[in-house]
Design a protein with these regions (language model features):
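Long, hydrophobic alpha/beta structural blocks
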Residues: 1-4, 9-17, 21-25, 29-281
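C-terminal structured domains
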Residues: 243-336
């Protein structure tokens, strides 16, 4: 999938003796091949991180002004990326000053389009010391961007925001006391909705099992174990970690499942307490009409007790319990 970069800027946030200093760079950098690669790498690395939270802009724009800065940017023609990023840097500086654990770095801002949706990516990247070869086959120190090591990043789905979607901001969670300032810089309200988060996780797990081409017994086992893991967290009132879930549920290749759960387009909140009421679809099917209702476990399909005919949209049940059989025989004998 192509990231079409519209605008990009890089500024610096430096920590000096307990305070922070902002150094502005160019606010409308050229999209060179190198810049495209850097933004593509940041986007891909952000997408792979499992520990993310999602939310929407907080109501208090005076305390959390990023929304109004972004609104002004989108309403100005031509859009003023310089003003947006400068104001956001001041907000970042202010929020970082409130948190002792906050650090600085190179702050990347990228406005890009992906699959007909527009995003603003913000990432703080530091440098690390490496080595390179010289022309006479010696080694020398060289500093370069630590792309894999960034801890602070967020993405605003501007199209989702404009369309009134419920969740359009995502950011890396990390340790709460460290990442909290970045969340407040974005102005993100992350009110947790455990039942909704659980239902969305269930749908993602079911889709994963289908996409992996699991046969029916394997799919039943996978989803049943997922339910057991989630119920364990729910009973203990412990937050569910996607990384831990993937490692236990798919120990042979946890990366495949983690990649799905981390997909920012799914907007799955990592680190919520599962709601047991929303776990049923992992092992149950149910439905009703005005005249009847039905519920059965997945293993009923595996054992052949329930058969679905997709062509005529009918369901056949076998192995009916004796009490139900007796009631039906009595009912039909009266009719006869």
């Amino acid at each position: 999938v192509t990231n079409t970069i519209i605008r990009v800027a890089i500024h610096d946030l430096t920590k000096t003796q307990g305070s922070f200093v902002v150094k502005h760079g160019k606010s409308d950098l050229k999209v060179t091949q190198t810049m495209q690669r850097v933004i593509d790498d940041l986007t891909a690395l952000y997408a792979k991180r499992t520990s993310k939270s999602y939310g929407k802009f907080a109501v208090d724009e005076d305390r959390f002004p990023t929304e109004k800065h972004l609104r002004a940017y989108l309403n100005v023609q031509p859009s003023d990326f310089t003003t947006l990023t400068h104001k956001m840097m001041e907000t970042l500086k202010a929020q970082a000053s409130y948190k002792g654990a906050a650090t600085g770095g190179h702050v990347f801002f990228a406005h890009f389009e992906r699959e007909e949706r527009q995003y603003l990516l913000i990432a703080i990247v530091n440098e690390k010391l490496g080595a390179s070869m010289t022309s006479d086959l010696d080694v020398q120190d060289v500093r370069h961007l630590d792309m894999d090591g960034f801890r602070f990043a967020g993405r605003i789905n501007m199209t989702g925001w404009a369309n009134g979607e419920e969740r359009y901001i995502g950011f890396l969670k990390g340790k709460r006391e460290v990442s909290e300032y970045f969340m407040e810089f974005l102005g993100c309200d992350t009110t947790v909705q455990n039942r909704r988060d659980t239902a969305e996780l269930v749908q993602a797990l079911m889709a994963f099992a289908t996409d992996e081409g699991m046969d029916t017994p394997s799919k039943d086992d996978f989803l049943a174990r997922a339910k057991t893991i989630c119920e364990r967290s729910a009973k203990a009132q412990e937050e569910l970690s996607f990384e831990a879930l993937a490692n236990e549920l798919s120990p042979q290749d946890p990366e495949r499942l983690m990649t799905v759960l981390a997909d920012p387009d799914l907007r799955l909140n990592d680190g919520f307490v599962p709601d047991r009421r929303a776990l049923g679809p992992l092992i149950k099917f149910k439905g009703k009409t005005p005249t009847w209702s039905i519920e059965f476990n997945r293993d009923a399909i595996t054992r052949g007790n329930v058969r679905f005919n997709a062509e005529d949209n009918t369901l056949t049940l076998t192995g009916l319990p004796e009490d139900l059989t007796a009631q039906l025989r009595a009912e039909y004998s009266q009719d006869g």
